[in-house]
C-alpha cells in the first residue's frame, strides 16, 4: 500500500478544501490533488462561478508515477494523456464543486448532460442505456438549489459507479444521494473538470504541480526504503 502523500489544504476564494476527505461512496480517505476556480469572461470581467477540488486515492501516486514521475508541473499541465490517465486510472476519485455564485440543480445538470451526450455522440458510443442514466442524473438535480457555499459532490469508483451527494453547509455528508452505475458518465464527469477541455484550468495546473511533487516524494521514499533494507 502506498504511503499517503503529505497533502495540504487549498483556499479558493473563501472556500477551503481540506487536505483529505472520506466522501460517500469511497472505501478510504482520499487526499487533495488540486483545486481551482471555474469562471468565464463576461463583458470583459472574469466572473467566478465555483471552486472545484479534486481528491484521489493514495495509490494514484504509484500508479501515475510509473509513467509520469520526473516530469515538471509544466510538462504535466501540457499533457492531455496525463489527465486522461487520472480519469481512467484504477483508483478512487472525488470532485467537490462548491458554489461561489448561486446555481439551480436544473441549470447544472442540463449543462453537464449536454456535455456528456455531445462527447458520447462524437465518439459514437451513445446508447439507450446512456439515455436512461442521463434521465436519472437530471432527476436527482431537478429540485435542488445551490446557494453560495453549498456543494455538489461526485465520487468515482474504479468499477464505474458514480456516487452523487449534496452539501448545503460545507461539510461532507456521510450518506450518498444516489449511486449511478455507468462508467462513461463517471469518467466524463471528472474529465469535464480536468480533461482536455476541462472547465477549470486553475484546478488542472494545481493538480499537475502537486502531483509532480507527490511523485517525487514517493520516489524518494521508495529509494530510502530500499536503501534501509539493504543496509546502505
From Swiss-Prot:
InterPro entries: CFI, Chalcone_isomerase, Chalcone_isomerase_3-sand, Chalcone_isomerase_bundle_sf, Chalcone_isomerase_sf
Positions annotated to bind substrate: 50, 192
Site (Important for catalytic activity): residue numbering on this chain: 108
Keyword check for Isomerase: yes
GO biological process, one term: flavonoid biosynthetic process
Catalytic activity as recorded in UniProt: a chalcone = a flavanone
EC number per UniProt: 5.5.1.6
Pfam families: Chalcone
Keywords, ordered alphabetically: Flavonoid biosynthesis, Isomerase
One Gene Ontology term of the molecular function aspect: chalcone isomerase activity
Pathway(s) where this gene product acts: Secondary metabolite biosynthesis; flavonoid biosynthesis
Extra facts: Part of the biosynthetic pathway for all classes of flavonoids, a large class of secondary plant metabolites, many of which are brightly colored.
Family (UniProt): Belongs to the chalcone isomerase family.
Functional summary from the UniProt entry: Catalyzes the intramolecular cyclization of bicyclic chalcones into tricyclic (S)-flavanones. Responsible for the isomerization of 4,2',4',6'-tetrahydroxychalcone (also termed chalcone) into naringenin.
Annotated protein name in UniProt: Chalcone--flavanone isomerase
Species annotation: Saussurea medusa (Saw-wort)
Amino acid at each position: 500500500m502506498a504511503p499517503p502523500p503529505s497533502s495540504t489544504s487549498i483556499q479558493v476564494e473563501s472556500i477551503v478544501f481540506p487536505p483529505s476527505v472520506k466522501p460517500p461512496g469511497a472505501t478510504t480517505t482520499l487526499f487533495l490533488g488540486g483545486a481551482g476556480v471555474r469562471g468565464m469572461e463576461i463583458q470583459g470581467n472574469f466572473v467566478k462561478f465555483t471552486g472545484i477540488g479534486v481528491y484521489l486515492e493514495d495509490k494514484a501516486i504509484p500508479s501515475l508515477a510509473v509513467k509520469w514521475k520526473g516530469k515538471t508541473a509544466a510538462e504535466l499541465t501540457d499533457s492531455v494523456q496525463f489527465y486522461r490517465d487520472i480519469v481512467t486510472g484504477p483508483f478512487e476519485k472525488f470532485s467537490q464543486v462548491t458554489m461561489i455564485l448561486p446555481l439551480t440543480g436544473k441549470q447544472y445538470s442540463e449543462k453537464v448532460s449536454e456535455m456528456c451526450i455531445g462527447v458520447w455522440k462524437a465518439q459514437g458510443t451513445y446508447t439507450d442505456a446512456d439515455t436512461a442514466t442521463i434521465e436519472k442524473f437530471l432527476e436527482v438535480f431537478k429540485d435542488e438549489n445551490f446557494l453560495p457555499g453549498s456543494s455538489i459532490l461526485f465520487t468515482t469508483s474504479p468499477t464505474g459507479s458514480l456516487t452523487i451527494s449534496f452539501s448545503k453547509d460545507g461539510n461532507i455528508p456521510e450518506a450518498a444521494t444516489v449511486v449511478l452505475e455507468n462508467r462513461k458518465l463517471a469518467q466524463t464527469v471528472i474529465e469535464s473538470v480536468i480533461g482536455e477541455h476541462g472547465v477549470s484550468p486553475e484546478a488542472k495546473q494545481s493538480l499537475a504541480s502537486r502531483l509532480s511533487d507527490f511523485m517525487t516524494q514517493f520516489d524518494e521514499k521508495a529509494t530510502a526504503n530500499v536503501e534501509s533494507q539493504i543496509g546502505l
